[in-house]
């Protein structure tokens, strides 16, 4: 689950980090009042969306008066912001953040952390190249990114943070501020179950203060039951409508841009199914994993979800029966086809637990379903069914 910038800053500030002060505004008049409340000569108005690249897309503007703040807010709120991280429709802007002017600054740094699946540890990344796309830095100048793995038994140690500060070229008060920032960020990461966080840029002001000018936090969705206050910050308007509906039925769904809908049980098999569709010249319209313990109701909802996409011109159902029984899947497919009024070809491959029984149920149903014998045969048939 992603947080908005203003929410991320509030959370980080509660852990002792110095952040760029700001006020969230849900309409132009609130934005104008926020400018006056901040009391500076300048302010920065930022669209609050769950996507990067806001500046290049026109979602970040410097304003010099309350009237300018009102005008910028009016141009953003109620519109969709399209960035390189969104789809063609973009993300809806329901609010803007009006933030204080912290410039001029002497330097812009980068600080972030993720759970590294290889080392199975929280890994911090820091760089002198703040304020730019860190992905570009990683690609063009990987040596400019410092990495620190944190031992989960003892946590992040002050000496590790000081070492990073030295390597970043910080000195005096800046070092102490950076250590406090990094230790506070780690505490927040662990206690709030972050999956990822980024501060870009982390600005070094002329007075030596280190301030978070931006903040990005992604929370581990599997741990949200432990954090009801954080869960209350969820903004469903920023989520893909189909993916949101899928999550309500415990389905793992990701929308893609192809025309062959996929329903599979198991993430690995789903990935393999998409690969072989591509191999045979097709393009998957989605990733959809109904899970190892799929129920009839979940399968029906999955089928509806696939066919809600008007780009879908054929469907491939690939089930390997282990915990889930193929005969139950077959009954759910029949029920879903009848309920949804399917008009596209449906290829079904069943293997494993009660596969023969499931195949017979489908064959006796009288529906125009295309049986497949093996994964390659299924991919070949679904691609050919497109004509």
Swiss-Prot record:
An example Gene Ontology biological process: tricarboxylic acid cycle
PROSITE patterns (alphabetical): ATP_GRASP, SUCCINYL_COA_LIG_3
Record-listed ATP binding positions: 46, 53-55, 100, 103, 108
Cofactor(s) annotated in UniProt: Mg(2+)
Pfam family name, one: Ligase_CoA
Molecular functions per Gene Ontology: ATP binding; magnesium ion binding; succinate-CoA ligase (ADP-forming) activity; succinate-CoA ligase (GDP-forming) activity
Presence of keyword Zinc-finger: no
Reaction catalysis annotation: succinate + ATP + CoA = succinyl-CoA + ADP + phosphate; GTP + succinate + CoA = succinyl-CoA + GDP + phosphate
Family: Belongs to the succinate/malate CoA ligase beta subunit family.
Biological role: Succinyl-CoA synthetase functions in the citric acid cycle (TCA), coupling the hydrolysis of succinyl-CoA to the synthesis of either ATP or GTP and thus represents the only step of substrate-level phosphorylation in the TCA. The beta subunit provides nucleotide specificity of the enzyme and binds the substrate succinate, while the binding sites for coenzyme A and phosphate are found in the alpha subunit.
PANTHER family named in the record: SUCCINATE--COA LIGASE [GDP-FORMING] SUBUNIT BETA, MITOCHONDRIAL, SUCCINYL-COA SYNTHETASE BETA CHAIN
Subunit text: Heterotetramer of two alpha and two beta subunits.
Name this protein carries in UniProt: Succinate--CoA ligase [ADP-forming] subunit beta
Source organism (scientific name): Francisella tularensis subsp. mediasiatica (strain FSC147)
């Amino acid at each position: 689950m992603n947080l908005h910038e203003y929410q991320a800053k509030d959370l980080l500030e509660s852990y002792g980090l110095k952040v760029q002060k700001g006020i969230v505004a849900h309409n132009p008049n609130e934005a104008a009042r926020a400018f006056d409340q901040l009391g500076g000569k300048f302010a920065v108005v930022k669209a609050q969306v769950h996507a990067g690249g806001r500046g290049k897309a026109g979602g970040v503007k410097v304003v010099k008066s309350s009237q300018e703040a009102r005008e910028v807010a009016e141009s953003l709120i109620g519109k969709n912001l399209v960035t390189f991280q969104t789809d063609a429709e973009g993300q809806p802007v329901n609010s803007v953040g009006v933030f204080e002017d912290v410039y001029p600054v002497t330097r812009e740094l980068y600080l972030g952390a993720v759970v590294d699946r290889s080392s199975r540890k929280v890994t911090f990344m820091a760089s002198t190249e703040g304020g730019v796309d860190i992905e570009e830095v990683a690609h063009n100048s990987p040596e400019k990114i410092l990495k620190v793995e944190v031992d989960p038994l003892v946590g992040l140690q002050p000496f590790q943070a000081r070492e990073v500060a030295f390597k970043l070229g910080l000195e005096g008060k800046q070092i102490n501020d950076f250590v406090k920032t990094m230790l506070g960020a780690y505490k927040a990461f662990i206690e709030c179950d972050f999956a990822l966080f980024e501060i870009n840029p982390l600005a070094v002001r002329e007075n030596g203060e280190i301030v978070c000018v931006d903040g990005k936090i992604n929370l581990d969705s599997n741990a949200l039951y432990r954090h009801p206050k954080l869960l209350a910050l969820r903004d469903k308007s920023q989520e893909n409508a189909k993916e949101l509906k899928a999550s309500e039925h415990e389905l793992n769904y990701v929308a893609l841009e192809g025309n062959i809908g996929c329903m599979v049980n198991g993430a690995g098999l789903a990935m393999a199914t998409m690969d072989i569709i591509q191999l045979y010249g097709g393009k998957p319209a989605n990733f959809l994993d109904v899970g190892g313990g799929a129920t009839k109701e979940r399968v029906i909802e999955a089928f509806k979800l696939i066919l809600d996409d008007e780009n879908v011109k054929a469907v491939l159902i690939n089930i390997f029966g282990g915990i889930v029984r193929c005969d139950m899947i077959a009954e759910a497919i029949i029920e879903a086809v009848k309920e949804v009024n399917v008009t596209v070809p449906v290829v079904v491959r069943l293997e494993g637990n009660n596969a023969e029984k499931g195949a017979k149920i489908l064959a006796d149903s009288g529906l125009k379903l295309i049986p497949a014998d093996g994964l390659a045969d299924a991919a070949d048939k679904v691609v050919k069914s497109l004509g």
